[in-house]
């Protein structure tokens, strides 16, 4: 699912398909151990994913690896994934949930805003060597 997301929306992630395509099964397993991963399915096929875990020291969680397959967009899949990450973060005892979204990804920003996320004003480069910015969004839990 991660590789499909990187191929379809390389502009939306802090990594690339080329960097991740040769990962071993053990590397994939280790990458998800510390996070709760959600997969949305339709007719047995994965159509979306998101993960939630600790943002760092403190009581904040973070949403990462959020992606919905193009044919499933606009059908409530993104809303379901946001709700799942929020509930997971609450259950884990986080006081706040953070995420980063590419600055010009208006559809994603509107999705998060519908669920109470707000821009914090913080920005960072999407990845080294890429001049695009992503902005941080936050939701109090």
Annotate each predicted stretch with a short phrase.
Residues 1-71, 82-84, 88, 92, ...:
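Acetyl-CoA-dependent GNAT
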Residues 60, 74, 108-109:
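Internal amphipathic alpha-helical segments of the cytochrome P450 catalytic fold
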Residues 75, 79:
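Flexible nucleotide-binding loop
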Residues 95-98, 102-109, 114-141:
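C-terminal "cap" of GNAT-fold acetyltransferases
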């Amino acid at each position: 699912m991660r590789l499909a997301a990187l191929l379809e929306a390389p502009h939306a992630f802090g990594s690339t398909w080329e960097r991740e395509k040769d990962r071993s099964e053990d590397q994939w397993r280790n990458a998800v151990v510390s996070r709760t991963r959600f997969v949305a399915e339709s007719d047995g096929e994965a159509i979306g994913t998101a993960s939630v875990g600790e943002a760092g020291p403190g009581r904040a969680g973070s949403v990462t690896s959020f992606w919905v397959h193009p044919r499933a967009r606009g059908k409530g899949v993104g809303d379901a994934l946001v709700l799942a990450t929020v509930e997971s973060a609450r259950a884990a005892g986080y006081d706040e949930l953070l995420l980063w979204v590419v600055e010009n990804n208006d559809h994603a920003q509107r999705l998060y805003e519908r669920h109470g996320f707000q821009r914090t004003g913080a920005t960072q480069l999407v990845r080294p060597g890429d001049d695009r910015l992503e902005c941080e969004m936050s939701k109090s839990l």
